[in-house]
Every structure is written in C-alpha cells, then in structure tokens.
Amino acid sequence: MANITVKLVRSRYGNTPKQRATLASLGLKKIRQERSFEKTDTLVGMIAKVQHLVEVTES
C-alpha cells in the first residue's frame, strides 16, 4: 500500500467539533505537524472531511 503524509496547515479552531475530533484522531495538534499513514479507505474519508485544513502528499 502507498503511504500518505498529512500536514496540518490551518488552525483547528473556528471549525466544527466533528472536524476537531477528526484532526485529533489523525494525531494533528499543532500547525505544521506531520503524520504518516498507510493509505486506507477510512483514512481517505477522514482527510476528505478536513481537506481545507491539511496538506496531503503521497509517497
């Protein structure tokens, strides 16, 4: 499977509680924090919910 790197580029404040919970489940707390994951359908769905807050790169 491919790996995905997710980077938080916008603040989580001012968003809905569901979006904040999604960021927390991705492990993103601070701006410019990055996490790497294996690409799964669940992960892709989570990223779609917060796509305006994160930057995604595939490797």
From Swiss-Prot:
GO terms for cellular component: large ribosomal subunit. The keyword Ribosomal protein applies. Keywords: Ribonucleoprotein, Ribosomal protein. GO terms for biological process: translation. Pfam families: Ribosomal_L30. It comes from the Bacteria. One of its GO terms (molecular function) is structural constituent of ribosome. The keyword Ribonucleoprotein applies. Belongs to the universal ribosomal protein uL30 family. Part of the 50S ribosomal subunit. This is Large ribosomal subunit protein uL30.
